[in-house]
Every structure is written in C-alpha cells, then in structure tokens.
Amino acid sequence: MVDIKVVSQRSKKEVGSFSTSSSTTVGELKKQISSKTRLGTERIRLAVPSKTSKLPNAFEALGKDSDLVSKHVGADSTLYFKDLGPQISWSLVFICEYAGPLFVYPIFYFLSNLIYGTDSPKSFAQKVALVCYSLHYIKRIYETIFVHRFSHGTMPIFNLFKNCSYYWGCTAMVSYFVNHPLYTEAPIERVYLGLGLWIIGEVFNYICHIQLRNLRPAGSTERKIPRGLLFEFVSCPNYTVEILSWIGFSILTQTLTSWIFALMGAAQMWIWAVGKHRRYRKEFGDKYPKSRKILIPFLL
C-alpha cells in the first residue's frame, strides 16, 4: 500500500492522504477524494507537475479514470487537485445550443412585420435557407442523442452559456439579413449550386459521424485510427464537409453575415482539427498514416 498525498493545485494546501495499491485506478482515487471533499467525481481533476512545459507551475492532468494511479505518481507520491466547478453533461449542452437556432431563425422568417416593420413575400432562396438551416440543427440534435459517443461525460456548466451565446447569437445575425424584406435573391443557378454543396456536406458529415461512432464501443473511451472514405485523406473530414456545407449555404443566400458565420466556424474547426491531428500522431505514432492531412486533402 502507498499513501498518496493530494494537494490543492491553487492554494497548495493538503486535501488529504489516501491509501492506494498497485491496482488502484484514477477513478477509484477520485471516489475517495469525493467522499472526503463531498464534491462529485466529475468535478475532480488530478494532475502532476508538467515535465514538458516551460511555463512555471504548469500541470498535466492524469489520463483516463481507468488508468492506474501508480502509472502517474512520482517519487514524492503527490498529486495535485483542482475543483472544476459545477458540471453538465456534454449531450445536454449540445442539445441546448442546437435547439436554440431552431427557434431563433424562424422568428425572423415568420415575424417579419413585427421585426422589420414591413413584410414581403419570401423568395425561393429564403425558403430553401430556412429548410437548410433548420435541418442542419435537427440533424445535430439527432446525432447528439443517437449517434455520438462522448469520451468525457461532463463539461463545466459555463460552457452552456458560452456555447449557446455563440450559436443563438450567430443564428440571429444570419437570419436577420437572409429574411430581411430588402433581401435580394441570388441567381437561381447559384441557389442550386449552394444547395447542392450543402446537401453533399450534410450527407458526408453524417457518414463521418457514423464512422467515428463505430470506432468506439458503447461505454468505452477506447480510440482507434479512423479509416475509410474521406478519413484516408484527412484526419477530420467531418469538419471538412461541414465547412463545405456552410460554404454552400453562404452561396445560396449570398449574404455577408452567412459568410462571416462560415468563416468563424471554419476557423474554430481548424483549431479543433489541428488538435485532433496532433493527438492522433502522438497516440498512434508510426501506425498513423503519414500522408494524411489535417483538414484539406493533399494540402493542409
């Protein structure tokens, strides 16, 4: 048996000393700490001083709850504790942030007279945009409930307000101008081009999500190398085709705010894709295909 000293990462005060064996997992140690601190295990983060960061007082969080504590503890048998604050499930956050656009976007479409002080018949492009925007978020909610398997059960509750503000606010920004009485419809060829790109993006995005789901057995946090179709070319094709989808939406609506939303989303997805690409290379090493790009086939 080994006594593990757990110290607050911020105050450096000792939280307590906990007995562990060579078979004690991180999750089991969290339960011991939870019993003493009366905090839920989802709020507890355990870390060790970073061996790679040059920043002072930098820490590296321990791995999965299934990892052995002995794998991480150094010679001084000390771990550092941080309270992550109130948590909320990933799926609930996603449902809330995706449900908002389904209510916000139609407000500008159906209540034009109340919002703009005047009304006009909706063009074909405006009708198509309403359907596309709504179907995108209906699809996202469906995937959250029935498709995605999350490696982490919860996230800080602050993310609920941050994420909802982004999606709901951007929806209002896009819908206000697309549904404006003075809106000028794009040439019909451009509308169909944008619609075609949107459909291709949405269909392949769903296919990518099904492929990712099939990589991870239910209730598991196991990671495997994604393979097949677009995954042979880029690490995150689900982001690639979602960007394509929003480009299509921007072409069919031809509004500046649609392009701004598409670019904002693309920038964020690029950041996520770079992070995932690096994690794949770090985790799988030489097994990971060297020719596979991050987001754009053969280029980036």
From Swiss-Prot:
Catalytic activity: a very-long-chain 2,3-saturated fatty acyl-CoA + NADP(+) = a very-long-chain (2E)-enoyl-CoA + NADPH + H(+)
Membrane topology: Multi-pass membrane protein
GO biological process per UniProt: fatty acid elongation; steroid biosynthetic process; very long-chain fatty acid biosynthetic process
Subcellular location: Endoplasmic reticulum membrane
EC number(s) from the headed UniProt entry: 1.3.1.93
Pfam families: Steroid_dh (PF02544)
Gene3D superfamilies xref list: 1.20.120.1630, Phosphatidylinositol 3-kinase Catalytic Subunit, Chain A, domain 1
Membrane spanning stretches: 91-111, 191-211, 243-263
Protein name, per record: Very-long-chain enoyl-CoA reductase
Lineage: Eukaryota, Amoebozoa, Evosea, Eumycetozoa, Dictyostelia
Gene: gpsn2
